[in-house]
Amino acid sequence: MAKTLSDIKRSLDGNLGKRLTLKANGGRRKTIERSGILAETYPSVFVIQLDQDENSFERVSYSYADILTETVELTFNDDAASSVAF
């Protein structure tokens, strides 16, 4: 797991356009699971384009600190059926 925010951003920059599964803390013991594509990375946040058949909205954004504090977990799904997790 990456130790700094810049390491996390660098890792996500290398996975732009890849399909992923998102697991986020929704508060009050709720866990939200969504799937989509890593669309864009910015200096402070990253944007995930969600699958439209499963979700009522198009995009979500999270900060790199959410990954560092383990509020958000990303699992990248490769074509070879292996996965890389953050």
From Swiss-Prot:
Coiled coil: none annotated. This is Protein Veg. It comes from Bacillus subtilis (strain 168). Stimulates biofilm formation via transcriptional activation of extracellular matrix genes. Acts by repressing SinR activity, independently of the SinI, SlrA and SlrR pathways. Could also be involved in the regulation of other genes during biofilm and spore formation. It holds the Pfam family VEG. Induction: Expressed during both vegetative growth phase and sporulation. Disruption phenotype: Mutants show poor germination in the presence of L-alanine and reduced biofilm formation. InterPro entries: Protein_Veg (IPR009366). Gene3D superfamilies: 2.30.30.100. It is found in: Cytoplasm; Spore core. Keywords: Cytoplasm, Sporulation. GO terms for biological process: regulation of DNA-templated transcription; sporulation resulting in formation of a cellular spore. GO terms for cellular component: cytoplasm.
